[in-house]
Amino acid sequence: MNRTMFKSKIHRATVTHADLHYVGSVTVDLDLLEAADILPGELVSIVDITNGARLETYTIAGERGSGVIGINGAAAHLMHENDLVILITYAQMTTEEAKAYEPKVVHVDQDNRIIQLGNDPAEGIAPGMTRPPFALNNAAL
């Protein structure tokens, strides 16, 4: 049996632009894609911290070092410039693979520059962010 497991995320990224009249997708700085092990064209879930919207789309590689997080097409009705978002990927794994897998977590600053890489999906490093109550860290599992 395969399980759908958390694979990677880019945490608390800032939307740099939202363009309604563009072919749908999300444009992401190639440095961020590589750090999170996300390929161009890969399915991502995007959660908007600012307004609670959620959607799925695919990635387009953006200029390396640009910090771009561009919401394209119809998704621009839901997510806007300067919104904080989380881009999340999932993968199908066997139970054995899932138990051994270490996800990629990319924390970014307000300019979408990488400030920390990790593998604990519950770790909060941004000011004011705390670990969810009762959440174990990966080392405790």
Curated annotation (Swiss-Prot):
Changes after translation: Is synthesized initially as an inactive proenzyme, which is activated by self-cleavage at a specific serine bond to produce a beta-subunit with a hydroxyl group at its C-terminus and an alpha-subunit with a pyruvoyl group at its N-terminus.
Protein family (similarity comment): Belongs to the PanD family.
Compartments reported by the entry: Cytoplasm
Species of the source: Pseudarthrobacter chlorophenolicus (strain ATCC 700700 / DSM 12829 / CIP 107037 / JCM 12360 / KCTC 9906 / NCIMB 13794 / A6)
Subunit structure: Heterooctamer of four alpha and four beta subunits.
Pfam families cross-referenced by the UniProt entry: Asp_decarbox (PF02261)
Keywords linked to the UniProt accession: Autocatalytic cleavage, Cytoplasm, Decarboxylase, Lyase, Pantothenate biosynthesis, Pyruvate, Schiff base, Zymogen
GO biological process: alanine biosynthetic process; pantothenate biosynthetic process
Cellular component terms (Gene Ontology): cytosol
Name of the coding gene: panD
Catalytic reaction(s) noted: L-aspartate + H(+) = beta-alanine + CO2
InterPro entries with a match to the protein in the record: Asp_de-COase-like_dom_sf (IPR009010), Asp_decarbox (IPR003190)
Positions with a binding annotation for substrate: 57, 73-75
Protein name: Aspartate 1-decarboxylase
Active-site residues (renumbered): 25, 58
Annotated pathway: Cofactor biosynthesis; (R)-pantothenate biosynthesis; beta-alanine from L-aspartate: step 1/1
MF GO annotations: aspartate 1-decarboxylase activity
Residues carrying Pyruvic acid (Ser): 25
Cofactor note: Binds 1 pyruvoyl group covalently per subunit.
UniProt keyword Lyase, yes or no: yes
UniProt cofactor(s): pyruvate
Function as written in the Swiss-Prot or TrEMBL entry: Catalyzes the pyruvoyl-dependent decarboxylation of aspartate to produce beta-alanine.
EC number: 4.1.1.11
